[in-house]
Every structure is written in C-alpha cells, then in structure tokens.
Amino acid sequence: MHVLQLCYKPPYPPVDGGTLAMNSVTQGLMASGHKVKVLSVCSDKHPVRSDALETQYKDATGFEAVYIDLSIHPLDAAVSLLCGESYNVKRFVSKEFDERLTAILQIESFDVVHIESIFLAPYVATVRKHSDAKVVLRAHNVEHRIWRQIATATRNPLKRWYLKKLALALRAYELEHINDFDGIACITANDAETFRGEGCRKPLADIPFGVDIEPIDNVDAEPQTLFHIGSMDWRPNEEGIRWFLKEVWPLIHKEMPAVRLFLAGRKMPDDLMQMQSEGVVVVGEVPDAAYFIASKQINIVPLMAGSGIRVKIIEAMSLGKTVVTTSVGAAGIDYTDGKELLIADTPQQFVEQVRRCIDDPELCSSIGAAARRLILDKYSNEALTQRLVGFYNKLGAVAL
C-alpha cells in the first residue's frame, strides 16, 4: 500500500507528543511493508531540524516540507473573528503547500492520503481533484473541545471571551468538514463518540498511539524525585504546570521537603527557566527524553484541558514509571486507578498520591511495572498499525 502522510509540523525527529504520534504511524506502516511519502508543514515555531534529520529517514519517506507563516497576525485574527472563520485553520492555508501537494499527486499514485489533524482539512479538495486515494483524518484531539476547556479555565474576561469565540469557530469548521473525509481514525473511543454525536456520518475507528520503547538499562531512578516532560508550546501543558507550581508544589514541599521536582521540555518559557523555587529544577529541552524519564521516580501530569491521548504518559508508562495525573490527562488510556495510574484532580489529591509513592517505594515500583505491562499488552505499535491498515482496507483502499 502506498500512503501519503500530510503532517501539520515536521514529524521527525520525534521530540514531543504530536511528533511521536505521527512518527509512530510512519514507522509502523514502513515496518509492515508499506510505502510512505511524508509531506509536512514547517514554520518558525516548528522548523525542519536538518541537523537531526537522518538520511535514512529522509530517503525512506521522500520527506518534504513547505514553509507556512503560522505566526499570529492581529489584523487577520480580527477579520476571522468578525467573519466567523476559524483562524486556527485559516493560518494553515498556503498556496505554496497546495502547489507542492498538487505536484506530488500528479507524479505519484497513492492508495491512502493520511491527514494528520483537522488543521490540514483545507487540502482535502486538492486531494480529491488529483487523486482517487481514500482520504483519512487522523484526529489527534477534538480540537474545539480543548479550546473550550482552555477558555473556561481562563480568568481574564476579555481573553476568555475571545478564546470561546475561537472554540466556537473551530467547532463550526469541524462540524462542516468532518464528513469531507472517507474515514476518521481517532486516538480514543471518547473522541470517536464525540464526532459521531456531532454529526459525523463517515466510518470512525479508535486507534490509540503506539509505542515500541525498550527499557533503559543501567539507569537508577533518583529517589524522591518528581518530573514533568512535555512540549511547553502546547498550551494545556504550560497552563497545567503553572497551576501545579502555584497550587500544589508549595503543599508538597512543605510536607516533603526532601522531594525535588524536575521540569523538562521544549520551548520552556523564559520566566520558568529563570524561576528560583526551592526544590524545583528547570532543565528545559533534554537531548534524550527516554533517559531523562528513566532517571526520575514519579511522573506528574497536571493536565486540565485536552482530548485524545497523552503521548508522554504512554511513553513514561512504557518505561515503567508511576504516573500521577488528572482524569483529563488519563483520558483514553485503558487503566485502573491505583493499579497502572494514580489519579489526582485537586491539589490535596496530588499531595496524597505523591506521598503514597514516596512513603512506599515498593508500591511505586509495582504501579510502574503494571503500567509497563499494560502498554506492552495494548499499545504495541505493530498491533495498532495492523488496526490502522485494516481500517484503510475497510474504506476500500486497495494497493495499486
């Protein structure tokens, strides 16, 4: 099968949740004997990292990227607001990207065009014009729901009003265009149910993010350490950590002064990089995420907004880490609270769950071991790739 994968940002190297999810599709399909061509958007925020783009990957995928200016332009944002357009989507519309996509479709034949995110939906018409391929949306999240959650949690009235407008415009766009695809591959069953409830008439599948991560040997986790790793240019990550630092960390530090908190991730805000808070170590981007995760004890993920599945939680669980997260953070994972994950939705609950792990290292280790078993059993990339290919076939995608 020949698949054209359209990505909303460069999927390689896989440095955050979105890139890990996209790259797992690429690698899974190629490992199963299918041919994949990758065409990606790149931007100032997410440039092509030529120094880290391995020749083997580039040759195997025929990787290409087209620059789009995704920066926020106040005038364009205001016009979109007045016209009721989704500015989130409009920023991805590019003549240059459309022209390159057209050229590729005219040169090569594809069985499936796999589109990563609703933000690239404007290019479905181009695919239909130049190809008979089945068009599949990989819905990483229900995007408008995330923006609605962020708006609800925003205290500034004017900012909250604007974010609600963005969420409404994005929802209107999703509802208008969700049936443009031949099928939608969601990350979670909950997201699939949401799309169905909002009028999706096309086939839906829930196919989680897959991982194939080997345990890191010869790395001892530092005792009494908490850590968070995640791209801080994704708004729910930043807002969750700021909430944790303000509402939770003072309580933990008061009750357990020996515990240290390590914060890692790309695009760490300057004020966090420079913060001086006792017991908190801000390291920013790390060269080896798996090694960093393995070297710490307890993963905290204080997400208050989001849908889909949190890739970094899956990664930490696959490495045998105990994860303390919110109900929102754990959404989409087939877990049992207290067995493979620990749930905390309030500051006091976070304190209690962290204390359980610190006071009982054996319990902490057993939860981490159960987490790894769960991921190996249900989130193997090989098995999930077969489900994705099965979904392609169900839609009528037949190898040329």
Go through each PLM region and give its residues.
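Acidic donor-binding loop of glycosyltransferase active sites
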Residues: 182, 291-308, 319-322
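A short, well-ordered alpha-helix in the C-terminal region of glycosyltransferases
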Residues: 363-378, 384-390
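Donor nucleotide-sugar binding/catalytic pocket of nucleotide-sugar-dependent glycosyltransferases
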Residues: 134, 164-167, 171-216
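Conserved catalytic-core segment of nucleotide-activated headgroup transferases in glycan assembly
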Residues: 206-295
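Acceptor-binding helix/loop patch of EC 2.4 sugar-transfer enzymes
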Residues: 8, 75-90, 135-172, 231
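N-terminal subdomain of nucleotide-sugar transferases
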Residues: 1-64, 106-108
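Conserved acidic donor-binding segment of nucleotide-sugar-dependent glycosyltransferases
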Residues: 341-348, 356-362
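Short hydrophobic beta-strand element within catalytic cores of glycosyltransferases
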Residues: 312-316, 322-326
